[in-house]
Amino acid sequence: MRNRFFLYAFLWLALTLVAACAQLPEYAKPRTIQIDQIPKDIPSGFTYRQLTPEDFRAPSLPENLSTHRENINAYTATQIRITADSNFSITRRFLEDPIDYLGRINHLAFEAVMIPNHSWWNPKIKAAMVGYALQHEQIHFALTELAARKLTRDARKWASNLSVIKETPQQVYAEIVQHLKGLIKSAMEANQKRHLKFDEDTSLFYSPSWQAWWLEMVTEELKQTESGKLGR
């Protein structure tokens, strides 16, 4: 029996500040929403590409950030999710007594998406800051895409060695999901540090050259990992 995963991975929330800060405020730090906390009705988004101001369609900031509206140029919601073609199989083993079920992952890959209806663009942003803010959010999107590609590479190695044997199909699925959550959690901890480092390097002060360095770095990494993406 072949099955699809009905599971999103996680949601990244990142923003661009208006003014320089001596220290990155707590509200401005990139956040991750874990698997079980993501709303079931979250709108679909689009996979990695160049962003435009028109991609930010949320009418307002989330309630927890509304009081900081004047300090935020842009707010981006990006998500890493399991691809639609990811699937696993559960087969009944007749040679064993009592009868049990074997679960294996046939294909597992991840993709990054930007969610326009949850992403906000400050209508009062200064014209001189539009390019900088858009580039900043583009880099966050790129970091999320790179994390998705790394998860896909790691998943290939991990999934090929995974076999789950349980008494019922439901138990098999639950065990597979539990293993999957562990894989995702480890990846999140590493990538969260990278998003935070980027914000600390570029949000505490206005530095086009430093942000351009980050853009060059992630662009090169995207080129180097493109073949792995196509192999999803």
What kind of region is each of these model predictions?
Residues 1-5:
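Positively charged n-region of N-terminal signal peptides that target proteins for export
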Residues 8-18:
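Bacterial N-terminal signal peptides
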